[in-house]
Amino acid sequence: MHKKFFTIGIIVIVIGCIGIIAGAAFVGQGFAKQMYLVESMKQENIKLGDLGVTGEDADKVIDNAKYAQMVADKVREDRHQIAPSYEALLGGKHFDPTDPKQLSYAQALNLENYLYLAVASFGIVDIALGTGAFMIITGIALILIGILLFKFARKIPEESS
């Protein structure tokens, strides 16, 4: 048995196991955060129709990136009808929470930020899930390579000095 290939095989298998464990952690965190996002959005119970979306999807609760993006874009469009920018809204003055126009603009801005943050969060979840899956597959491949190195080490005699 060739000790050098045997040792390399062990190292490769250990790295593969670490990859699988890390990948499983990524996947676990990804699914946990995805469930958290979906449940949090369902608790808010904001429906597409509440924000001006018409059609067959109007009664659906915003609970995914597609709906959040669609509605955030709609809120942004509606907000720009109030004023093209925050600076234009204030007209060189300070924010006045008693002004209904400024208050509506601020509420739209908050809702828009909430929805775009949800879109970004779902994207990060997808990245975590994809990265975790890749790490698991890579870990499995490394373990298989380590096993092949073991078999190879058995067939090669130890070099004599």
What are these regions (language model features)?
Residues 1-14, 123-161:
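Juxtamembrane interface at the cytosolic side of transmembrane helices
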Residues 10-24:
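Hydrophobic membrane-insertion alpha-helices, especially the h-region
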Residues 21-32, 144-151:
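Structural signature of transmembrane alpha-helix termini at the membrane-water interface
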Residues 27-47:
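Alpha-helical transmembrane signal-anchor/signal-peptide segments
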Residues 42-113:
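Long, solvent-exposed extracytoplasmic domains/loops
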Residues 100-136:
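Short, aromatic-rich amphipathic segments at membrane interfaces
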